[in-house]
Amino acid sequence: MKGSYKSRWVIVIVVVIAAIAAFWFWQGRNDSRSAAPGATKQAQQSPAGGRRGMRSGPLAPVQAATAVEQAVPRYLTGLGTITAANTVTVRSRVDGQLIALHFQEGQQVKAGDLLAEIDPSQFKVALAQAQGQLAKDKATLANARRDLARYQQLAKTNLVSRQELDAQQALVSETEGTIKADEASVASAQLQLDWSRITAPVDGRVGLKQVDVGNQISSGDTTGIVVITQTHPIDLVFTLPESDIATVVQAQKAGKPLVVEAWDRTNSKKLSEGTLLSLDNQIDATTGTIKVKARFNNQDDALFPNQFVNARMLVDTEQNAVVIPTAALQMGNEGHFVWVLNSENKVSKHLVTPGIQDSQKVVIRAGISAGDRVVTDGIDRLTEGAKVEVVEAQSATTPEEKATSREYAKKGARS
């Protein structure tokens, strides 16, 4: 009984599987028949279209820019540090107790402004003593001169000897010398009193105070009272390769001050503009560079002592230069070249001679002319004589290109 029961179940399962397989097979044939007419129609239409696709594929998309003619400034660049035109540590020239400070930390001061005071009592006393001694010796001199006058009259009648007359004359001369010494003592005491009032020796900005009121200070203190840095004007010291010396000297011979620009650490913002002050008198043999100093008015306090900046010095301007985007300039086995577009948007390779350049623009001295269109993007897909599709043409007459040109003219280039 159990064996026949299992056999029936096996037969049922086999029948169900066979039915499902037959259904799938029949459904697949119907789908093939319904798709056949469309496929046949497509097959009838495809040969011509297929041959057309083989003959002409899609055009390579490129971006292009127009070569323009413009004046291009040439800059020499270097790294530099802002230095104060003068740095003065204000120290006391006399010993005594500091009784007053007359400045605020960070304040701009003028030469002669009162900065600090030392207790003047001892200096006033010394001055009074010197003045008293001077007055005493002046009285002695006056009396000696009167005696000399009497001796001279008596000597005419031989009432006094020649020796006595000479002695009186010597006394007068001695007293006159004493007077001069007294006058020097008075001047010295007055100077000590004057030095008890400490004034600014130069214009500039005071730093943080180095000593507090009430402290005893002396002329031998090395830290001083405060440091003044002169920042109006302020200097920039930067270095240039020794190969640039001839260029700078030649530009100086033109007779016009050379403009130097100070840019921030990231070279993205111009901080100030000044002029070349001088070149150092020797080259650093270790680095092969020479130090250059420029001076800035710095009335807006844009520059600060010990600030790191990028320096750019204008040495020449190339007029009527043919300029293209730097992205268009390529380098191959033959040398530098660009891809030039003709009126039919077909490209051809032109060997060129580049001049001064920066990250945005490059001057082309030979190989193309102003008005030529050059490929700036999509260059890796180009072959000689290929026709391309210009998807974004740029020209120096567009607002965007004008802005780029202005930025280029502002930043300049370096050969």
Swiss-Prot record:
Residues 1-21 form the signal peptide. Residues 399-415 have a biased composition (Basic and acidic residues). It is found in: Cell inner membrane. Residues 32-60, 392-415 are annotated as: Disordered. InterPro entries: CusB_D23 (IPR032317), Multidrug-R_MdtA (IPR022824), RND_pump_MFP (IPR006143). The MdtABC tripartite complex confers resistance against novobiocin and deoxycholate. MdtABC requires TolC for its function. Part of a tripartite efflux system composed of MdtA, MdtB and MdtC. Belongs to the membrane fusion protein (MFP) (TC 8.A.1) family. This is Multidrug resistance protein MdtA. The lineage of its organism: Bacteria, Pseudomonadati, Pseudomonadota, Gammaproteobacteria, Enterobacterales. The gene is mdtA.
